[in-house]
Amino acid sequence: XDYENSSLWGELEXEL
């Protein structure tokens, strides 16, 4: 897993 991707998805999921 990519740490960078995880961080970005974490922020996006929070909005979604």
Swiss-Prot record:
<protein>
    <recommendedName>
        <fullName>Autoantigenic sperm protein 7</fullName>
    </recommendedName>
</protein>
